[in-house]
A protein has these predicted regions:
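Short conserved loop adjoining the S-adenosyl-L-methionine
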Residues: 88-93
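Conserved N-terminal segment of class I S-adenosyl-L-methionine
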Residues: 1-87
């Protein structure tokens, strides 16, 4: 993705197509940045060491970063490890320096269990990175995104939500052993990026 003023201007012109009307697979043909690219770009500068990407989808982040592994419960291509349960992963304790959940925590019904698993897998100096959209935008988006991944797997399942409020994300992470270090917005303020560190409080 070209990170330039010209690219940013072209992406802005294309907002209706990029964010609503067009399948994300079409955007590169028009020179527009996909949501997946924007999310990966927002996350990349916070990655360190060996990375585990939970809910990796097409495994774009790991294929770009090239030091880690992506896992998902669905096969989307790209080389991610397909698992039955992302709260019980086949890795030893403290195997990773960074765990990411990019635009997917709201799609995991057993969120607390997955965050506890992330805590188990992180080294003491590790960090957890989450991106999220709020439920109002998310519910509208999932209703109109005819190309959304949930449509390809039969729709939203019980326990999934269109998005999560910041208060929910922060509360869940605090309860599972994380402390917030950074929170910022991206993609015109509609997406949230949270960077947590492992909390060592007993």
């Amino acid at each position: 993705m070209k990170n330039s003023m010209l690219q940013a201007a072209w992406d802005f012109v294309g907002i209706p197509f990029r964010l609503v009307l067009f399948d994300q697979k079409w955007l590169p043909y028009f020179g527009w940045t996909t949501l997946e690219e924007a999310r990966c770009c927002a996350v990349r500068s916070y990655l360190k060491g060996r990375v585990l990407d939970i809910g990796a989808g097409t495994n774009s982040l790991i294929n770009q970063y090239d030091n880690g592994v992506g896992v998902d419960i669905h096969e989307w291509g790209g080389g991610a490890l397909v698992v039955e349960d992302t709260s019980r992963l086949p890795f030893a304790d403290e195997s990773f320096d960074t765990v990411t959940l990019i635009a997917c925590l709201n799609h995991i019904p057993y969120r607390q269990a997955v965050l506890r698993e992330a805590r188990r897998l992180l080294r003491p100096s590790g960090r957890l990175i989450i991106t999220m959209i709020n439920p109002l935008l998310g519910n509208v988006g999932h209703a109109i995104w005819w190309y959304g991944e949930d449509k390809h797997r039969g729709g939203m399942k019980e326990g999934e939500t269109g998005g999560m409020w910041s208060s929910e994300v922060l509360s869940l992470c605090r309860e599972t052993g994380f402390r917030l270090r950074r929170h910022r917005r991206f993609v015109y303020g509609m997406n949230h990026l949270y960077v947590f560190e492992v909390s060592h409080k007993q």
